[in-house]
Amino acid sequence: MAVPKKRTSISKKRIRKTIWKKKAYWASLKAFSLAKSLSTGNSKSFFYSKF
């Protein structure tokens, strides 16, 4: 018989949320850094065709 799961505590929920936010922050920082280097032409590791 199916039994409902226990409720996740607020602190655990908050911890998971901050981990997710931190990962998103670093991903956006990397993407912005890459975009900046591409726009200035300083990129050495990212290959793309210049028009």
From Swiss-Prot:
A Pfam match is: Ribosomal_L32p
Task: Quote the subcellular location field of this record.
Answer: Plastid, Chloroplast
Give a GO cellular-component term.
large ribosomal subunit
- Keyword Ribonucleoprotein in record: yes
Principal place of residence: plastid
GO MF term list: structural constituent of ribosome
Keyword Phosphoprotein included in the entry's annotation: no
Q: What keywords does the record list, in alphabetical order? A: Chloroplast, Plastid, Ribonucleoprotein, Ribosomal protein
Can you supply a Gene Ontology BP term from the record?
translation
- Entry's family note: Belongs to the bacterial ribosomal protein bL32 family.
Could you tell me what this protein is called? Large ribosomal subunit protein bL32c
Give the species this sequence originates from.
Answer: Oenothera elata subsp. hookeri (Hooker's evening primrose)
UniProt lineage: Eukaryota, Viridiplantae, Streptophyta, Embryophyta, Tracheophyta
State which gene encodes it. Answer: rpl32
